Amino acid sequence: MDYKDTLLMPKTDFPMRGGLPNKEPQIQAQWDEKKLYEKILKKNEGRTPYILHDGPPYANGQIHMGHALNKIIKDMIMRYKAMNGYYAPYVPGWDTHGLPIETALTKKGVDRKSMSEAEFRELCRAYALEQIELQKADFKRLGVNGDWENPYITLQEKFEAEQIRLFGDMAAKGYIYKGKKPVYWSPSSESSLAEAEIEYQDKVSPSIYVAFDVLDGKGLVDDDVKFVIWTTTPWTLPANVAIALNKDLDYVQVRVNDTSYIVAQALLDNVCDAVGWDKEGVQIEKTFKGADLEFVKARHPFIDRESLIILGDHVTTDAGTGCVHTAPGHGEDDFIVGQKYELDVISPVDGKGVYTSEAGEFEGMYYDKANKVITEKLEASGHLLKLDFFKHSYPHDWRTKKPVIFRATPQWFASINKVRQDILNAIEETEFKVEWGKTRIYNMIRDRGDWVISRQRVWGVPLPVFYAENGDIIMDKAVIEHVATLVEKHGTNVWYEREATDLLPEGYTHPGSPNGVFTKEKDIMDVWFDSGSSHRGVLEARPELSFPADLYFEGSDQYRGWFNSSITTAVATRGKSPYKKLLSHGFVMDGQGRKMSKSLGNTVLPEKVVKQMGADIIRLWVMSVDYLADVRISDDILKQVSEVYRKIRNTFKFLLGNVNDFNPATDAVPYAELVEIDQFMLNKLYTFVNNAHKHYDNNDYLFMYQELQNFINVELSNFYLDYGKDILYIEAQDSHVRRSMQTVVYEVLTSLTKVLAPIIPHTADEIWSHTPHVTEESVHLADMPEVQSVDTALIGKWNHFLEIRDDVLKAIEETRNDKVIGKSLEAAVYIQAKNEEDQALLKSFDNLHQLFITSYAEVVDEPQGTDYNLSNVLVKHAEGEKCERCWNYSTVLTEESHAHPHVCPRCLSVLESK
């Protein structure tokens, strides 16, 4: 007889196959239709706010996996906070000014010189907004929940106005100044660069040793002696005005082939090796302390100019000669030491890297090509001691990938010195997940120079500065506020569309402009000043947000970028950090740990993965990686994640299928009346949920991923749900033992769905839509399951039982291999524990055979089988015949003539109760 229809088999419409690429857009359309983001905010209105401030990605180009990693973790954080009772608005942002957009337009064929600056800026604006729409669609497709209709954008008039006001506040406090100073300069971009825009790449440079003749030895050094310098930038020699020594080092005057030279004693051997001097033939004539040689004068090797001997702490014995070529116009250390000695700042190179008339005979030559010409000139005059070439790490423009130079130009600076200690104090008060994050930003602030905030471009926020006829700088607070008001109304193009007098307050006068003539600054602000002002233009400006934010979370490159500029401007103007906590993630590499690049063909694009596998697969991958370090992704890695997803989905299908006839309002069993194994599984669930809260709060998603797999695969699938089939399918529908188990299955189903909702939001909402008797229209409007106290004694008891059960499973497997049995229900188990406590534990169960998933189990007092870890186990083929309904073996089955033939007493009882 076929008893299939008498079994309570799982029933659910929840499909086995995810079909995420097609299903996710439908779910997202429902979210938009329901105005889910607004409903989530409404639900938590008036509760404790949690503010994660979005670091703005640059509005140019397709999003990559680094963007996906960043946005998905932010979304996981905010979805969890919202489900955990926080008012958690998420306002995405975009960074929109700067060179890449200008370059992108040029590549599209825009001829900048054929139009006005204002017209070119309009094209830049339109391009940026177009890019934002493309990126926005990609971010939304990843399931990122936020105020996408009202993002903040650095080109918005209100944002730009607040940025100008922030500049005004810093100027009023004396933190803004103009000076000629060597800055990182990119000839390929024709602009100065901030430290954050520099990346290091290998470069081959000339290495030359040059002799400078003594001009005035101050009675210490003879006139025919030469100082030896070493440099890898021969092109900077036209700007040389000094040679720096270290006051504490010993210097030696040595005789080599009838000529005397001065070098640091500690470097003499190195110099001999480098220039080819025979060490045996080198005679030390005199020894000096560096301090003794201060103010000795040398002669420039090819320009009629003195080169003063000065002292500087930056001179070391790490390399070179201990005598350092000093050009204040081309080096930061040179500039600093040069200020002390009031040296001329000579920088005879223009914005394109071409020598100016100040370079004399080299005028019109590109700086890099001058290396060869200058070296040849030195050789011809006998000043070149050695030329070599070597590969070293050299600063490059992070956008054009071309080398940069140090070049002294008139620039605007934000003083770091004046606020450095305050920023360091603010860092001390900031929370960091990892200590190295704190060390990194602390050291960067401690060691950084003043911040170059000017750029020689047009697409950006203008520096709101005017000049009087006599050259006086005008930075009055009232003037800057007037400009901010104009910008708030008309946007920053007003700066380019109006004359200086029309940008100043009506009737404005200045003693430096007797004729009422003014000019305006042409430079724009560094883009890091744009995004670094977002705490003012966004956190303080938007009513749903607040300053300081609870969290800033970006890639680890932002310690020198956005984290740095933000805390600098916030401390300078508000006296405190804009973030309470700082968290960072690593970079996304390929499966072998290599950087992704088109040339290697190893790029994995979010768009492609979403189309092939779905966004929830990318999100589950994000959960699975240690994001604090660099992470790896590849097709193989994503396939592994897909397998984990499939297992999760199958588990949910089973859970849903077994509560189709369960109503928690009428069928749930109180905890005290639950069958003990169900109490155990409920406590296991509580443990998982409690840990999930802890991991969410600590941003430890990898730990949660590992515990999730253990809970689903080991606790549920391998044990509880496997054991449960004999109850859920076989027992009477309304029996206590079945309702007890359904109570726990339902709790596992709803709790697990909620816990996973921030991770795989599409799948979680799909599960929720198939879950009977839930009241919320979306899982994202539900509350996270609460932290519960756990019965550790009960868990300990059952965990130990499961260890004994492992012995039984091994014995069953061995018996199956010996072909004694097939399925485990064909087995009868005879077990004796190795100690009295375990023996008593086994005897306390009245359904041991069910727990072993066998037809029979008996606790025996004498060992009959094989010794295992905790017990002695014998497995035989079960006696009797197979019940045609439950497939358990029984020695008592109904006869063929019975109304319900060939069933065991338990099944007969169930059938007769219907």
From Swiss-Prot:
GO molecular function, one term: tRNA binding
Binding site for L-isoleucyl-5'-AMP: E554
Motif stretch ('KMSKS' region): 595-599
Location within or outside the cell: Cytoplasm
Cofactor comment text: Binds 1 zinc ion per subunit.
GO biological process, one term: isoleucyl-tRNA aminoacylation
Annotated S-S bridges: none
Cofactor: Zn(2+)
PROSITE patterns associated with the record: AA_TRNA_LIGASE_I
Record flagged with keyword Protease: no
Short motif ('HIGH' region): ranges: 57-67
Annotated ATP binding sites: K598
UniProt-listed InterPro entries: aa-tRNA-synth_I_CS (IPR001412), aa-tRNA-synth_Ia (IPR002300), Anticodon_Ile_BEm (IPR033708), Ile-tRNA-ligase (IPR002301), Ile-tRNA-ligase_type1 (IPR023585), Ile-tRNA_ligase (IPR050081), M/V/L/I-tRNA-synth_anticd-bd (IPR013155), Rossmann-like_a/b/a_fold (IPR014729)
Reactions mediated catalytically: tRNA(Ile) + L-isoleucine + ATP = L-isoleucyl-tRNA(Ile) + AMP + diphosphate
This protein's UniProt keywords: Aminoacyl-tRNA synthetase, ATP-binding, Cytoplasm, Ligase, Metal-binding, Nucleotide-binding, Protein biosynthesis, Zinc
E.C. designation(s): 6.1.1.5
Gene Ontology CC terms: cytosol
Source domain of life: Bacteria
Binding site for Zn(2+): C883, C886, C904, C907
HAMAP family on file: Ile_tRNA_synth_type1
Record text on subunit structure and interactions: Monomer.
Family: Belongs to the class-I aminoacyl-tRNA synthetase family. IleS type 1 subfamily.
Function: Catalyzes the attachment of isoleucine to tRNA(Ile). As IleRS can inadvertently accommodate and process structurally similar amino acids such as valine, to avoid such errors it has two additional distinct tRNA(Ile)-dependent editing activities. One activity is designated as 'pretransfer' editing and involves the hydrolysis of activated Val-AMP. The other activity is designated 'posttransfer' editing and involves deacylation of mischarged Val-tRNA(Ile).
Entry domain remark: IleRS has two distinct active sites: one for aminoacylation and one for editing. The misactivated valine is translocated from the active site to the editing site, which sterically excludes the correctly activated isoleucine. The single editing site contains two valyl binding pockets, one specific for each substrate (Val-AMP or Val-tRNA(Ile)).
Name of the protein in its database record: Isoleucine--tRNA ligase
Species of origin: Macrococcus caseolyticus (strain JCSC5402)
